[in-house]
């Protein structure tokens, strides 16, 4: 009976944990961000959720151009670049995302960002 309880606990924990780590989606910009950047970021998130990574990337790049000091914009760019197999470019934006994260746990705790940029480099 004890073993059965342990097995059930492990199964329940596993199923509840998987959604939290399965997919890392694009992030909203922080409150108070540039209005144009927010608009482009929302368009990017919409396209990203649809699987239109090239279109999403265009919007995330525009959001970054509007305000390059927002870590979420760089993170979203990096997600698209990763999905498109452009891992070198993704790594550069993951470093920028970390640099400008302002402590955002969604960025700092991302497995994907830590896989791409595991060691701090100058400027990150």
Regions found by a protein language model. Name each.
Residues 42, 76, 109-111:
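Canonical tetratricopeptide repeat
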Residues 49-50, 83-84, 116-119:
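Register position in tetratricopeptide repeats
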Residues 61-65, 99:
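Conserved structural position within tetratricopeptide repeats
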């Amino acid at each position: 009976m004890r073993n059965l309880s342990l097995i059930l606990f492990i199964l329940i924990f596993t199923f509840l944990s998987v959604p939290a780590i399965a997919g890392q989606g694009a992030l909203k910009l922080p409150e108070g961000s540039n209005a144009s950047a927010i608009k482009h970021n929302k368009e990017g998130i919409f396209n990203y959720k649809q699987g239109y990574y090239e279109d999403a990337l265009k919007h995330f790049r525009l959001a970054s151009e509007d305000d390059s000091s927002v870590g979420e914009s760089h993170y979203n760019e990096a997600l698209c670049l990763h999905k498109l197999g452009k891992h070198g470019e993704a790594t550069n934006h993951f470093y920028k995302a970390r640099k400008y994260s302002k402590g955002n746990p969604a960025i700092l705790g991302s497995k994907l960002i830590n896989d791409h940029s595991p060691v701090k480099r100058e400027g990150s």
